[in-house]
Amino acid sequence: MGWIYLLLAGLLEIGWPVGLKMAQVPETRWTGITVAVLFMCASGALLFLAQKTIPIGTAYAVWTGIGAAGTFLVGVMYYGDPTSLLRYVGVALIVAGVATLQLAH
């Protein structure tokens, strides 16, 4: 069950940077802040549950890896963030690292 909690925590980790991005626009400032806080709390709570069965270092690395890769993809797909082959290689390395940590557990 810990890995399910951790996967969900990582996916929710993507929500708070999106909320902060929303908060940069005056019309959606408070909505964005609310989204960011709610996603932070939910993600943190699920990370807490995951750490009951997964070592802290592994859980934190996987959590941040999912969040970083997911936020990168959201930024590219919805916010027009710049891309390059090297940036995609970097994200692929993060994903490979997360997969390796899961296999090593």
Locations of regions flagged by a protein language model:
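Polytopic alpha-helical membrane proteins, predominantly small-molecule transporters/carriers
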Residues: 1-105
